[in-house]
Amino acid sequence: ATHQYIAPIEGTHLKLTIDETIQFITERELEKVFQERKAKRAAAIVMDPSTGEILAMASRPTFDPNQFNQFPASNRRNYAINDAYEPGSTMKIVTSAMALEERTVNANSRFYCPGSVKVGKESIQCANGKAHGSQSFAEIVENSCNVGFVQVGLDLGVERYYKYLTAFGFGEPTGIDLPGEAKGIIVKKETAATANIYLATMAMGQANAVTPIQ
């Protein structure tokens, strides 16, 4: 028999963006909130806004990798990338970016909030249940005013709103290169064009669903 010796080749390096101190704090604080709120699930992500690097990512419920078979299979699900939810008022920052870029508003644009607004047959109220009255654009952001953001969304219109949804990557995986990443759920543009209520609710963070990583 002949023998052939093949010299080993050094493997490639794998460098994580995770910061172990930030990861430890994130895990600790998420567990604390998860227990206090008696939540069914929770996720937290810490990102470097300059580079997009993920400094920490945690999900609850979780499991011990050394004894994974002693935990429900569902505990191995990474809710930070696997699950979609309505983002709520955090989406107002995205809507703000759209409107400022398109110059449909500026910091001093005026809005009036009587506490609710009628869109088609639906009535949309502000979360605090009270009227904010006359506000600048900066103030509707500060107050997270639903009525104000309904108007911002409607002023943008379907075409421009969807242009930016696509540009921001909503409705598609981010490409984080982790298994099982969901793409979220976006109302079809053709559907949104049929009634103002779709755009009105999207502008304040409802109707569409996103993943925490998005």
What feature does the model see in each segment?
Residues 2-5, 18, 44, 49-89, ...:
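Beta-lactam-recognizing serine transpeptidase/beta-lactamase-like catalytic domain environment
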Residues 2-42:
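Conserved, well-ordered alpha-helix/loop/beta-strand core segments that scaffold catalytic motifs
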